[in-house]
Structure formats: structure tokens, C-alpha cells
Amino acid sequence: KKTENLILCSGKVYYDLLEAREGIRNSKSTIIRVEQFYPFDKAKFQEVVAPYAKAKRIVWCQEEPYNMGAWNFLFPIFEEMLGRRPYFAGRTATASPATGSLTLHKIEQAALVADALDQTQTSHT
């Protein structure tokens, strides 16, 4: 299958992405886990992503808010290695790493997974 959407992620969100992708008919998303941030193995990363370098969309997906987690460390490396800045799929910037509400957490989690898989429904209300 041809990859149109390359998703880079780390940790538990990988399993959420896999589960959601299984429910999408004819998904053109490839998911790659990045688990070693430092020292970052640029040669290994290049080897793993090379077959997907021409994907229309490259995404970094994380559960943490925009201003937390691995994004701020990794996006300059990804930009250098991929020649473009990946799209960020995750929670908006916030002072707290958690919502404090399980219901809201589940809603946000489903939204960031759908966003990463390019399955968001745009509302025009």
C-alpha cells in the first residue's frame, strides 16, 4: 500500500493509533515509533523513514500538550532530516499536563488520534 500519511509517535499513543487505524478501511497511514530521543540516531531514523519520505503528510503525534513532551526537542531534528516540519497532532498548549477529567481526557485522546490519522470531521457551525 502507498503511504500518504506518515505518523511518528512515541509511547502508549502508538497502540491507540494502531487500534484506530485498524477501523479505517483502506488506510494509507504508516505509524513509526520513535523511542530513543537522546542520543538521537539520525542514521537509523533516516533508514527507517526513507521509504515514506514522499508521504503527502508527516505527523508527530503525542498525548502531551504542545508545550510539553518530546515535540519541542524532536521537531528541529525531524525538520532537518525530513526537509519539512511535521504536522503536530496532540493537545493544545496548557499549563497542566492533564485535564483532570477522565471524560475530557478520552475526548481529547480520540481527537488527537483522529487528527493524526487525518480522520477529523470539520464542523462548520
Report the location of each language-model feature.
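Peripheral docking tails and interdomain loops at the edges
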Residues: 62-125
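Residue-level signal for secondary-structure boundary elements
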Residues: 25, 57, 121-125
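Glycine- and acidic
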Residues: 2-4, 30-33, 56-61
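Short, well-ordered loop/turn elements at secondary-structure boundaries
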Residues: 1-4, 25-26, 53-55, 83
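Active-site phosphate/pyrophosphate-binding segments
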Residues: 1-9, 13
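Active-site proximal loops enriched in glycine and acidic residues that flank catalytic Cys/His/Asp
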Residues: 9-11, 33-36, 41, 61-65, ...
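Generic long, charged, amphipathic alpha-helical segments
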Residues: 14, 18-54
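Hydrophobic/aromatic-rich, well-ordered segments within soluble, folded domains that form packed cores
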Residues: 9, 45-48, 52-66, 73
